[in-house]
């Protein structure tokens, strides 16, 4: 087992007490209540997430980014969004490379929590996109022109939902074949 894999597994263990939820601009934690998310959400810093113990994938990826950076492991982060004119589901996730293999590190998406190994980045991205489509988009409603994938860099903390979308959409567009 490589050092990167050991560190990634240690992070999964460290994140066990972090729940899927969000913190609003007043500092109130919301678990399971997303009614005011689009108006009141603000992106947390890693220290804030560690304190609140609740974050959506956007917050959790920033915590993960910080952890991997502290351990000198190069990573990339990706933003998936399906612009359907309604709820516009999203997912962010982190990828790293170890010993020639690519790894999808996943904590927030509980169904797929863990480390997932791939031969190349295209295989990894395609798999995550297919899982996202199958899990988040109703059968028959999928239109590939509405799905966007961007690689993005570290955002400023405190961004609103709209600001976070705009930031990620300004990242590097990734063309994924379905």
Question: What is each residue range found by the language model?
Answer:
Residues 1-178:
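A structural boundary/capping signal
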């Amino acid at each position: 087992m490589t050092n990167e894999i050991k560190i990634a597994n240690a992070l999964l263990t460290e994140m066990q007490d972090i729940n899927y939820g969000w913190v609003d601009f007043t500092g109130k934690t919301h678990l399971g209540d997303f009614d005011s998310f689009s108006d009141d959400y603000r992106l947390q810093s890693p220290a804030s997430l560690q304190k609140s113990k609740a974050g959506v994938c956007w917050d959790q990826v920033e915590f993960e980014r910080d952890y991997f950076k502290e351990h000198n492991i190069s990573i990339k982060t990706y933003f998936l969004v399906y612009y359907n004119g309604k709820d516009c589901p999203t997912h962010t996730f982190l990828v790293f490379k170890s010993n020639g293999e690519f790894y999808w590190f996943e904590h927030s998406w509980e169904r797929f929590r863990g480390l997932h190994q791939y031969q190349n980045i295209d295989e990894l991205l395609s798999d995550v996109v297919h899982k996202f489509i199958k899990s988040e988009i109703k059968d028959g409603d999928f239109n590939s022109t509405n799905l966007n994938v961007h690689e993005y860099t570290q955002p400023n903390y405190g961004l609103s939902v709209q600001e976070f979308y705009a930031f990620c959409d300004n990242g590097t567009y990734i063309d994924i074949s379905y």
